[in-house]
Amino acid sequence: MDLRVGRKFRIGRKIGSGSFGDIYHGTNLISGEEVAIKLESIRSRHPQLDYESRVYRYLSGGVGIPFIRWFGREGEYNAMVIDLLGPSLEDLFNYCHRRFSFKTVIMLALQMFCRIQYIHGRSFIHRDIKPDNFLMGVGRRGSTVHVIDFGLSKKYRDFNTHRHIPYRENKSLTGTARYASVNTHLGIEQSRRDDLESLGYVLIYFCKGSLPWQGLKATTKKQKYDRIMEKKLNVSVETLCSGLPLEFQEYMAYCKNLKFDEKPDYLFLARLFKDLSIKLEYHNDHLFDWTMLRYTKAMVEKQRDLLIEKGDLNANSNAASASNSTDNKSETFNKIKLLAMKKFPTHFHYYKNEDKHNPSPEEIKQQTILNNNAASSLPEELLNALDKGMENLRQQQPQQQVQSSQPQPQPQQLQQQPNGQRPNYYPEPLLQQQQRDSQEQQQQVPMATTRATQYPPQINSNNFNTNQASVPPQMRSNPQQPPQDKPAGQSIWL
């Protein structure tokens, strides 16, 4: 039985949860396009989906704002159909073992600034800035950061007169305590400054892997919020941003000194990180940590498969197989990371726990040498496998292209860049993959993209009239099962 909303959108597996509802994978039965469907019970104590859908419609057209396809009531549920997106930044953060490089954080920050500035420019504040509410796109929008979950958003000024809402106190905490601003904890009405302060906490979290107020013990939610507030009040900006470039400290100090109704200087804040990117000689090429790690792993495994196919490597040998234990998974990730650092040393610059000061760009760039030294312990066969895998990909790509009357361009060979810059190892294969994704998107080929936390739930439809295909299911998910590990022998030498 097909369970549908809006007559043409079929409900699939559960893929996540928002502030006031669950989100499911869906399919447009007419076009085959994949979508996301958010359901909220009409018996909810504080229904928000109708309000959220109106905010989406009002913000539609902005870069990184999902497009709403349909909203309405189906049976005992309010349903909203929007664009299907990729993994959240929290999912990707966990994939990268809870640490992003400075380059990835800067590239994300510049996009997140733009999303928040657009929302503020349309007279709304988000009020729940956190990694879970920023998702990467799919296909040709795979490098674009999207913002979701406007159930807690609020209009902070009049649409016509732009008159700001009045200052108030004794407000309850709205949002996520970990990333909430100090003024939000103090019960002060939120405004634009609070979204930006929350974003600062998110960026520091990405760099350091945690925030000082995580892991505090408490018996009640109120006690936990109070302890988080106390910790935030006692941690200075200098301490919070120790070990990070000075620009992070300047950003947090600026946000904390904003007045309630003051318009932030978004250009100044963006310029802080743009200038830092220039000082560190980064390129905004949208090649994030997870992109490089997945690409590196794929190239090594590609060479493993070729060696097994040629008979040069036994798939069941100790060199080609690996245990599925947790320790071995961690070791595998570390080897992949070292491989990526060896090939792309200027990309992986990280926060160092021992740093108690704000490192200069020159000190950060010195990590390039450390990255090379750290990767020197890798077996030569791993480095050769990565090189061979990349070379095989370049050789096979022209053969995979669709034949046409015009000759296909040949892939460029790796060349050492002038002035001792890094070789152009990766753009060509990744850009060609993006071009193929773009062509598939234009041909309306459904793309199977799921979030890292997706598991198929069990759907009980016994309480529904099977003759009414448009009635949504009574969602009763069984406890989620962890994803099954790959069998031994799926990673070369890892």
Swiss-Prot record:
Q: Give, as one word, the top-level EC class.
A: transferase
Its cellular-component GO annotations read: cellular bud neck; cellular bud tip; chromosome, centromeric region; cytoplasm; cytosol; Golgi apparatus; monopolin complex; nucleolus
Q: Which residues carry this modification: Phosphoserine?
A: S143
A GO molecular function assigned to this protein is: protein serine/threonine kinase activity
The record's listing under Pfam families reads: Pkinase
Q: Where is the composition biased (Polar residues)?
A: 445-479
Q: Which residues form the Protein kinase domain?
A: 9-278
**Where, by residue number, is the active site?**
D128 (proton acceptor)
Protein location: Cytoplasm; Nucleus, Nucleolus; Nucleus, Nucleoplasm
User: Reaction catalysed?
Assistant: L-seryl-[protein] + ATP = O-phospho-L-seryl-[protein] + ADP + H(+); L-threonyl-[protein] + ATP = O-phospho-L-threonyl-[protein] + ADP + H(+)
- Provide the protein name: Casein kinase I homolog HRR25
Specify the species. Saccharomyces cerevisiae (strain ATCC 204508 / S288c)
